[in-house]
Amino acid sequence: RVEVLRGPASVLYGSNAMGGVINIVTRKQQEEGVKNNMQVGYGSYNTLQTEFSNRVKKGCFSSVVTGSYNRTDGHRPDMEFEQYGGYAKLGYNFSTFWKVWGDINVTHFNASNPGTVQTPLFDNDSRITRGMTSFALENHYEKTSGTLSFFYNWGRHKINDGYGTGEEPIDDRFN
């Protein structure tokens, strides 16, 4: 489930939530056992979308692991896109009042931009990897609740924003 909250929400989500918040509530296994799910879709322009998920709940332990692969040739030459993604979340309930969890999300994609039909671009490619990890300790009592959370975001972007046809990329543009 995705919640979009417009306007300042710094009281609930921290001082950087001045313009709004996108809160992604991940699915978790409610009943005991293991649940697997796989989705595959194929369409025009050699477009492929895949996702696999595994959810586990055993006693106080829970986990979610997902992986995805998406690609397309695009509707024009030199407009390819390819994406790999992975997500893992582990949780443990110490009691009915206290739980701890941690997760990691990593996505890598390769994309090509051919420019406009009137002004084509050559070798305008991007290779981007983004990641996020978090850890939380939560408590929920009848009249009070609280969470101590830590977040870390990171990324590596390699973007070739254009150079002359047949020339090598300029080092300071490709980092």
Regions found by a protein language model. Give the residues of each.
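N-terminal periplasmic accessory domains that precede
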Residues: 1-4, 12, 16-39, 50-53
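Membrane-embedded beta-strand positions of outer-membrane beta-barrel proteins
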Residues: 2, 22, 36-40, 65-67, ...
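Transmembrane beta-barrel domains of outer membrane proteins
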Residues: 5, 25, 53-57, 66, ...
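Outer-membrane beta-barrel pore domains and translocons
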Residues: 7, 25, 39-45, 68-70, ...
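Hydrophobic, lipid-facing positions within transmembrane beta-strands of outer-membrane proteins
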Residues: 20, 34-38, 48-52, 84-88, ...
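Strand-connecting loop/turn motifs
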Residues: 31-33, 47, 58-61, 95-97, ...
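Solvent-exposed loop/turn segments connecting transmembrane beta-strands
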Residues: 40-50, 75-81
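Flexible loop and strand-edge segments within Gram-negative outer membrane beta-barrel domains
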Residues: 72-79, 83, 93, 97-146, ...
